[in-house]
């Protein structure tokens, strides 16, 4: 085969017949046969290209499948997202119209009740604090009175001790004087007996 071969498929997906380069320098009869052989190969090459594109080149089929899948996916996704958005809109509308006013009313009612309870608890705590303050004041007064009484008793006790000590000292001094007198008398008597 002089330069002729199977056609290679292009990127476009269709097989184009290749031109047959005929650079043969043949004599006159042969020159007439070569173009006739080239024209005979053209339909074969074309058929081979079509067979290749039908059997081996799946790009058009795959592209069609991809387009169909994308179209179906976008339609289903669009409908699903539309349903989600409608459900969200419905939920928001119900929340704004029904639930939010109920929550506000319930919160207002409960807050009033809680506020009243807090006020009552605050009053009770204030009363308890006043009672506790009064108890502490009474207790402090009792402690001060007890302290003053103890100080007075201590002063009285110290004064009594001082007077008793003075009495004891006085008695001791008198007793010492008596003993001195007694000893001096005894010494005088002894002196009388010694002189004998």
UniProtKB/Swiss-Prot annotation:
Annotated PANTHER family: BIOGENESIS OF LYSOSOME-RELATED ORGANELLES COMPLEX 1 SUBUNIT 5
Pfam families: Muted (PF14942)
Domain of life: Eukaryota
Name the record gives this protein: Biogenesis of lysosome-related organelles complex 1 subunit 5
Gene, per the UniProt record: BLOC1S5
Organism: Gallus gallus (Chicken)
GO CC annotation terms, alphabetical: axon cytoplasm; BLOC-1 complex; microvesicle; transport vesicle
Complex and partners: Component of the biogenesis of lysosome-related organelles complex 1 (BLOC-1).
Biological role stated in the UniProt entry: Component of the BLOC-1 complex, a complex that is required for normal biogenesis of lysosome-related organelles (LRO), such as platelet dense granules and melanosomes. Plays a role in intracellular vesicle trafficking.
InterPro entries associated with the record: Bloc1s5
GO terms (BP aspect): anterograde synaptic vesicle transport; endosome to melanosome transport; melanosome transport; otolith morphogenesis; positive regulation of pigment cell differentiation; vesicle-mediated transport
Family, per entry: Belongs to the BLOC1S5 family.
Keywords: Coiled coil
Chain coiled-coil ranges: 103-196
């Amino acid at each position: 085969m002089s330069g002729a071969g199977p056609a290679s498929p292009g990127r476009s997906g269709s097989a184009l017949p290749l031109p047959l380069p005929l650079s043969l320098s043949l004599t006159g009869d042969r020159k007439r046969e070569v173009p006739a052989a080239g024209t005979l190969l053209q339909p074969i090459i074309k058929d081979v290209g079509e067979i290749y594109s039908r059997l081996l080149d799946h790009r058009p089929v795959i592209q069609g499948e991809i387009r169909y899948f994308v179209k179906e996916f976008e339609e289903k996704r669009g409908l699903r997202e539309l349903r989600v958005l409608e459900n969200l809109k419905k939920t928001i509308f119900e929340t704004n119209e029904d639930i939010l006013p109920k929550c506000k009313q319930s919160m207002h009612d409960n807050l009033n009740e809680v506020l009243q309870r807090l006020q009552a608890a605050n009053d009770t705590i204030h009363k308890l604090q006043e009672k506790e303050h009064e108890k502490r004041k009474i207790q402090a007064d009792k402690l001060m009175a007890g302290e003053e009484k103890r100080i007075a008793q201590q002063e009285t006790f110290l004064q009594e001790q001082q007077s008793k000590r003075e009495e004891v000292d006085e008695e001791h001094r008198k007793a010492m004087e008596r003993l001195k007198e007694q000893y001096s008398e005894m010494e005088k008597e002894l002196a009388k007996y010694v002189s004998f």
